[in-house]
């Protein structure tokens, strides 16, 4: 079901989704009250939802759905500061992913974002709705060409050189990751290792996401900027639309924010971050891969393990989508499989 007050946007979204094999839009609605009436007749598997609508706003509608009958919801939002803030509220209320709304250049949307919309809806359809309901509190694929991390950071053999005692944590996640990261980061004490994070999310939204977490956590959380130092008690989140790499200078770690082609159809890519962590930190790193669709991060987590890092994959029961962790486990990249609730404790105890 597509719920949006713009007839033009509804038409574009329906056209894109109905052309995708295996997807059928069973209904549309111009506002949540109309959507509720139609859902009484036939309940959708996935809802694509605008957040700013008349009669009832999307957040109120989303909370009603999650309390009565948890259903995967994809937020379709504008690339504005206000839109980003409201989208963060929607993700906290149980939405599984966000895609950017078609702007006036609808032809450009069909060229650039149609595949992202279809892939995100497919991912949402596989979400663990029981975990969605339990996770409620008050990503996206890009180009079809699939690159590996080699296009950003060519592979090299051997473990990290020059020793240091400073520890770091690298986390990668996608669908369901906003809620998962909130659960992990809010449980961390102020004194903990420096953390670098890739969460698949469109540009413009990661700054609002980081700001929201910063207000909830004991640790500091910010959107990463080029040459930011990775320091204890702070988490850096990759900006949407950019790759994030870990670099080493003497005994200190810094991040590099790079342009470049999508890797595993994602930008930022978890594989890019994990490969750079394997190279820069070696056995001083802890790699964690959490809920998400696809295989981004699976190869990189294995590289981290081979470089001497401790590595963890989230278990199936607590994952919204058990795709990325499953693939990492399958390839031998995870030396431990843990539920989401154990991640924060593991970060503190393993890296002491």
From Swiss-Prot:
Post-translational events: Phosphorylated by CheA. Phosphorylation of the N-terminal regulatory domain activates the methylesterase activity.
Provide the protein's localization: Cytoplasm
Can the keyword Secreted be found in this entry's annotation? no
Q: What is its main location?
A: cytoplasm
Q: What's its EC?
A: 3.1.1.61, 3.5.1.44
Pfam families linked to this entry = CheB_methylest, Response_reg
- Chemical reaction(s) catalysed: [protein]-L-glutamate 5-O-methyl ester + H2O = L-glutamyl-[protein] + methanol + H(+); L-glutaminyl-[protein] + H2O = L-glutamyl-[protein] + NH4(+)
Please explain the role this protein plays, according to its UniProt record.
Involved in chemotaxis. Part of a chemotaxis signal transduction system that modulates chemotaxis in response to various stimuli. Catalyzes the demethylation of specific methylglutamate residues introduced into the chemoreceptors (methyl-accepting chemotaxis proteins or MCP) by CheR. Also mediates the irreversible deamidation of specific glutamine residues to glutamic acid.
Sequence similarity: Belongs to the CheB family.
Question: What does the entry's free-text domain comment contain?
Answer: Contains a C-terminal catalytic domain, and an N-terminal region which modulates catalytic activity.
- Write the protein's name: Protein-glutamate methylesterase/protein-glutamine glutaminase 2
